[in-house]
Curated annotation (Swiss-Prot):
This is Large ribosomal subunit protein uL13. Keywords: Ribonucleoprotein, Ribosomal protein. GO terms for cellular component: cytosolic large ribosomal subunit. It comes from Laribacter hongkongensis (strain HLHK9). GO terms for molecular function: mRNA binding; structural constituent of ribosome. Part of the 50S ribosomal subunit. This protein is one of the early assembly proteins of the 50S ribosomal subunit, although it is not seen to bind rRNA by itself. It is important during the early stages of 50S assembly. The keyword Hydrolase does not apply. The gene is rplM. It holds the Pfam family Ribosomal_L13. SUPFAM superfamilies: Ribosomal protein L13.
Length: 142
């Protein structure tokens, strides 16, 4: 019996919608990253993108445990000397609620071309509405 290896054109991808209301950021991001990679499928192959599409709604209602709302920092740099910017979780959540979950999931995916393809299958929305009803996403309870 030969070892099965998934081919990119044979992969069947499903669409799932996840409600992030009152979910803990890290636990939700870990499960989303697992499903974007396709590790929940028996035909998982490390060098092939076998994951599903994930639509996350209510990203503005995510929560973190402990004192991370004030202690967790997000950094970015302009490229110029002294051009570092710092925001807390609460500041980023208020201004760009989608970005918090996107950054958490992106850090859990592989770096390189395969990881970039995987993160494109993640769709995050702050409110309860999303424009992907034509794909008929199934509700996923995490």
């Amino acid at each position: 019996m030969k070892t099965f290896s998934a081919k990119p054109h044979e992969v069947k991808r499903d669409w799932f919608v996840v409600d992030a209301t009152d979910k803990v950021l890290g636990r939700l991001a870990a499960e989303i990253a697992r499903r974007l990679r396709g590790k929940h499928k028996p035909e998982y192959t490390p060098h092939v993108d076998t994951g599903d599409y994930i639509v996350v709604v209510n990203a503005d209602k995510l929560r973190v445990t402990g004192n991370k709302a004030l202690d967790k920092k997000y950094y970015r740099h302009s490229g110029y000397p002294g051009g570092i910017y710092e925001r807390t979780f609460t500041e980023l959540q208020n201004e760009f609620p989608e970005r918090v979950l996107e950054k958490a999931v992106k850090g859990m995916l592989p770096k390189g071309p395969l990881g970039y393809a995987m993160i494109k299958k993640l769709k995050v929305y702050a409110g309860a509405e999303h424009p992907h009803t034509a794909q008929q996403p199934k509700a996923l309870e995490i």
